[in-house]
UniProtKB/Swiss-Prot annotation:
This is Conotoxin Lt28.5. It is found in: Secreted. Residues 1-21 form the signal peptide. Contains 5 disulfide bonds. It comes from Conus litteratus (Lettered cone).
Length: 85
């Protein structure tokens, strides 16, 4: 087998071995991207967002759509924020 054919064969087989060794790519999670996008738009000043991200899905206190974790009430089936003053 000539060198060129051997090189082409190696180049075709090598990526298959690499893909098998690494495994398939992780599944794409649209929900995580939506939450991340919402956080970037509305909650710049708060660092730990995940515990209360569902607490205030619409603009409430300060027009940011966020309320602090300390005032977020998650005792019932859903989390709620206090009314704005």
């Amino acid at each position: 087998m000539p060198k060129l054919e051997m090189m082409l064969l190696v180049l075709l087989i090598l990526p298959l071995c690499y893909i098998d060794a690494v495994g398939p790519p992780p599944p794409w999670n649209m929900e995580d991207e939506i939450i991340e996008h919402w956080q970037k738009l509305h909650c710049h000043e708060i660092s730990d967002l995940t515990p209360w991200i569902l607490c205030s899905p619409e603009p409430l206190c300060g027009g940011k759509g966020c309320c602090a974790q300390g005032v977020c009430d998650c005792s019932g089936p859903a989390c709620t924020c206090p009314p704005c003053l």
